[in-house]
């Protein structure tokens, strides 16, 4: 599988952009600030439905525009399909396949699988739990068709439940005579949905971690040395899911115990939004004991493990994205990731300096030239729009004169 052409409209810093890729290694070279990371991020969003750089769609849309569009021509096994997503600054994101009917973006997540390697990957080990949850969400979205929809539904339910808890906490918007009972009744309904969706998400995440564990341990040992033992440990907030065959009743009792605390704080105190994934090295938490080099290697092994699992489960080689990673790595790790990249169907690499371009056959794209070409196209479009507007104005005046 590979992307042959990518087009962006109003995506971050790109007003309009069209570029062609080839199978194998593609390198986007240009100084910082030209927008090369935005290009490969657009591929990540098309693939996974989200970006590792932001939790909101708003930053993905060029300022002053209501939406951004990403279109990709994808070739796989001799067939070509066109995937298009429309990212709304506010509201639902939509998608089309081959110009067909509009559908939710979540419905095409994973159809163009990709795995990204970025400078922020070390935070998968050293960063906060939200970083690791985002990784789990992207991984599960690639591997489990229903996951993206379940996550979206859970996020909505969690917001509704939190809003009711806040009402109970500060009394805002509650009718003195009847309102509190109505809020409590609503809270009971939302809590039931919160538990049902939360249990499913927890099970899905646990299954994904189970798929990743063996290749992660094996790949880390091959990169760092056979004597090093790395492992993944799921730390779910709903730990009842791991302890009971029917965890919903136990979780419901847990909510009853913490109800006063939730009302006092006005927020959901347990649930998948508080899950974590611990990376362990030699039976110790890596974020506390591993060196920077060991953290980099663990993050690299985790992404390589995800690639291996997606390849095996989906029977397709994901597109590999290497975003500005070579400047961050020593020669040994550069070699390891290049050996991995050269075996893949398509690799998109961003580099700032020409000296960072890896040796070997590659399709190199000059991002500065692409930016200049894009600006010329924007100017042509603006001029044409002005001409059309002037023509309409003249036509209108002529009609008025005749009448």
What are these regions (language model features)?
Residues 72, 346-353:
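Structural recognition of the conserved hydrophobic beta-strand(s) that form the central parallel beta-sheet
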Residues 323-325:
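Walker B catalytic acidic pair
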Residues 6, 68-74, 91-98, 277-282, ...:
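Short polybasic amphipathic segments
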Residues 107-111, 119-196:
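A conserved P-loop NTPase coupling/switch region
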Residues 44-131, 135-147, 215-218, 247, ...:
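Nucleotide-state sensing region of NTPase/ATPase domains
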Residues 1-31, 45, 174-319, 328-332, ...:
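Conserved NTPase motor "head" modules and their coupling/switch loops across ABC/AAA+ ATPases, GTPases
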Residues 36:
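Conserved lysine of the Walker
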